[in-house]
Amino acid sequence: SLEDLSQPERILNQLDELLEDTLKLKEYDVTNFGMDAGVCCFSRKKNLLLYSGAKMNLYIKHDNIVQEYKGDKISLGYSQKPHPLQLSSHQINISNNSSFYIFSDGITDQIGGPKNIMYGKKRILNIISKNSKVEKTIFDISKDLESYQQNNKRRDDLSLFGFSIA
């Protein structure tokens, strides 16, 4: 229903059910199919953002400070989990000139660099804190990750989403 679209944890629960039905997880008791996700719902009238994450965190940059809002430690899909999901929601007052980022663990877990270690969250947050424009931030993270990865194989999906509110 439309009411549910303003509640990100409900959207994630609906997505979880859709994944289970589409992949027939209950029917085959398959446990290795699923995904991590995050959902933002924004009210311009109230300058309020609601966020719910399934193993995905939200990062908000305002005035060169990056703040982390943690998602819950549960993924969507996968048959071995509670039903319905017990997901929390963050209610965040926002101000103009804020930028928002969500990224997958495929980025942070990518092996590379001179020591062949994981890329890490710290590198991403450093780039986010240095840039003022979302487009430039995403471009810089993409280029830095590509350079860091070198000849190492990609381990997972690489998902990076950013937006701003002016």
Predicted regions and their residues:
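Conserved subregion of the PPM/PP2C metallophosphatase catalytic domain
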Residues: 1-166
